[in-house]
Regions:
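N-terminal helix-rich structural modules
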Residues: 8-152
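Short, Lys/Arg-enriched N-terminal segments with co-localized hydrophobic residues
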Residues: 2-7
Length: 152
């Protein structure tokens, strides 16, 4: 692998991508990626896709409803047409990010269940506002029963 001569220069690079709740997300430079062959980049792509599938398995193993909750909230997050600056939506976003980071609805260290910062009414209205066919509930299931069971 060729060493990029610019690596020796002090560059300003923001390693912190985002902070929320008690978490800080970092990113890193991957020197030499541009010099990889197309075949090597393709391998990295397929490994990343395998990791995403493994992530779903981990979510499922960490809790019976984790995957369903994540997919439901992701649907609300991507399809919601309301005010995204509303405190309830902002809190839903933070809750979803915590779920992504911890691979489920429990804290990654303390194992405490996350408490949503949005109201049940907001979630109900948000779920009503999205196409029900996009929600991951399965045939004949209703989100109303699921929400009662999952968020108590």
């Amino acid at each position: 692998m060729k060493v990029d001569k610019s690596m020796n220069k002090m560059e300003e690079f923001n390693y912190t991508v985002e902070q929320f709740a008690d978490l800080q997300l970092l990113r890193y430079k991957v020197y030499g990626f541009e010099e990889l062959s197309l075949k090597q980049k393709e391998l990295i792509y397929y490994l990343s896709q395998a990791a995403l599938q493994g992530r779903d398995i981990l979510f499922d193993q960490n809790g019976k409803y984790n995957l369903l909750i994540r997919k439901m909230l992701e649907t609300v997050y991507t399809e919601y047409q309301g005010d995204r600056t509303d405190v309830n939506f902002v809190n839903l976003e933070t809750y979803l990010k915590r779920i992504w980071f911890s691979n489920g609805i429990h804290h990654h260290y303390a194992s405490d269940k996350f408490v949503p910062g949005f109201t049940p009414e907001f979630l109900r209205d948000a779920l009503n506002s999205v196409d029900a066919l996009k929600l991951p509930l399965g045939k004949g299931k209703q989100w109303k029963n699921f929400v009662k069971k999952s968020f108590r």
